Amino acid sequence: PPNNPEGYPTEWGKFTDIQGKAPADYEMDPEMTHDEELRPKIMQGLRDLPILSWVTDKENLFSHENDTARGGIYILTGPPVGDATGHGWTRPASAELIGGPQGHDMQIDCGLRLHGGHGRLAEKNPKHSFRLVFKKEYGPGTLEYPIYGENEPAKFNQLVLRCHFGNTWQHWGWA
């Protein structure tokens, strides 16, 4: 897909520490995907992996209303102040897990929010972690599905996707 899909913002959020906004980035790194040696490996890897897809209204991610009920969670959840970890910024979504060696075929309605603290700020981390939240408000109160295999835990209140920014400090290169 293009790095500037129609109808999506070209900038994410606003910086709190510096002026400006973070440039939006929707694509895989072209230096990797266009490399003749890496491209076939990437394509095969994508076919071999299970796919977790989540869907929500575009406005749930990118609305510019700075309001916990209607604001876009990808661009407005802001830094953690006190106990502010994005709980009021959960949006309805649908998640689907398909394919992979396990032959997954699962769909569930859920809540979607950004995961983390300062990693939610666009100037600190250009791509964010998400959290799928299973509450009766959005669908079933829990996800009961053997994501990790038959002999592993299979009941979840939430799943964190792309968790990073743990013991690191990742910033854009501002050169």
Identify what each model region corresponds to.
Residues P1-A175:
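Phosphate-handling architecture centered on phosphoinositide signaling
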